[in-house]
């Protein structure tokens, strides 16, 4: 996929994900994340890739989660139920072993990421 076909925030993050793709794998989006520990969330046609910066000694991990291992994707909000469903900029991706919470720079990015992950889970 050409860069103009991929939604992304930072070119260096897109390049980092592209360097780790499997043969034939396509990137749909790479969103910069805010908050402690998370660098970005990438969504491909085969998996979700999380960059985790929370390791001791300034080490960084890239974690791949195949869609078949994701048990749920959630919208996380501090508000009571009501109003716009996607007025939050945080989603959570759960597996049988952990839940990964990702805060984005805007509710529109959270909405897009949530819908892409959910679409792949339901295929």
Regions found by a protein language model. Give the residues of each.
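Anionic N-terminal interaction surfaces
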Residues: 1-42, 94-96, 112, 123
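Phosphoinositide-binding peripheral membrane targeting modules
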Residues: 30-40, 44-88, 94
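Intrinsically disordered, low-complexity acidic/polar segments
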Residues: 38, 57, 102, 111-113
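Canonical phosphoinositide-binding patch of PH/PH-like domains
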Residues: 92-111
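Terminal and domain-flanking low-complexity segments
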Residues: 107-123
